[in-house]
């Protein structure tokens, strides 16, 4: 419940009024969608929503956060694989093979590796001397992470905001205007 509230709080379309068309790189007459540009008011609202969601998201046990990212990986690897590949092909002009590597295989790997490596990092603890107990605890940074992602790599665009979110940080994600089609697909898997 907290995770969904946090993600939904941040998934806000712009209300600034300015719009731009998302087109296929190989055919600019083929419009894939129209995006409403965020303005300063939208940015402030997103920051406020992120900061309001931060305590609940940080308090959510790691295993519950990890389950969200592992579920997204399973969805991308399974029933949403073709949709993610198609969005990457249409929006970024990639071939079938390039899209399969980028939006399916690598994004799934990133999400799963992030969980595995985070579990490993958190399980490593400093040595203890007799009569002394040392313990390392991980907690999120203060504030929020602002993730600006590239136009040409769906896997990196999905991973850049996912990694700090897995570790308990709230993230504002600004995907490239040229990658809105696949970014919408990635965000949809988390909501």
Residue ranges and their predicted role:
Residues 29, 50, 65, 88, ...:
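Residue-level signal for inorganic ion chemistry
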Residues 71, 87, 110-113, 185, ...:
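Alpha-helical scaffold segments in soluble metabolic enzymes
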Residues 1-34:
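Hydrophobic face of amphipathic alpha-helices that form TPR/SEL1-like repeat modules
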Residues 24-26, 35-39, 86, 92, ...:
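Active-site proximal loops enriched in glycine and acidic residues that flank catalytic Cys/His/Asp
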Residues 37, 41-51, 55-56, 66-82, ...:
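Long amphipathic alpha-helix in the N-terminal Rossmann-like dinucleotide-binding domain
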Residues 3-16, 60-69, 83-89, 99-103, ...:
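Short coil/turn segments at secondary-structure boundaries
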Residues 89, 118-191:
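Rossmann-like NAD(P) dinucleotide-binding subdomain of oxidoreductase/dehydrogenase enzymes
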């Amino acid at each position: 419940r907290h995770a969904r509230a946090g993600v939904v709080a941040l998934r806000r379309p712009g209300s600034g009024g300015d719009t731009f068309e998302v087109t296929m790189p190989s055919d600019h007459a083929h419009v894939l969608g129209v995006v409403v540009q965020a303005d300063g008011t939208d940015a402030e609202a997103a920051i406020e929503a992120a900061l309001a969601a931060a305590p609940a998201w940080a308090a959510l046990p790691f295993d519950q956060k990890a389950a969200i990212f592992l579920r997204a990986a399973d969805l991308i690897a399974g029933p949403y694989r073709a949709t993610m590949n198609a969005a990457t092909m249409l929006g970024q002009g990639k071939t079938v093979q390039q899209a399969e590597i980028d939006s399916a295989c690598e994004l799934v790997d990133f999400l799963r590796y992030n969980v595995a490596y985070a579990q490993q990092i958190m399980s490593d603890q400093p040595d203890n001397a007799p009569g002394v107990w040392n313990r390392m605890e991980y907690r999120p940074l203060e504030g929020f992470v602002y993730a600006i992602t590239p136009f040409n790599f769906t896997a990196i665009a999905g991973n850049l905001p996912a990694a700090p979110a897995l570790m308990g940080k709230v993230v504002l994600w600004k995907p490239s205007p040229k990658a809105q089609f696949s970014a919408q697909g990635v965000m949809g898997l988390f909501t």
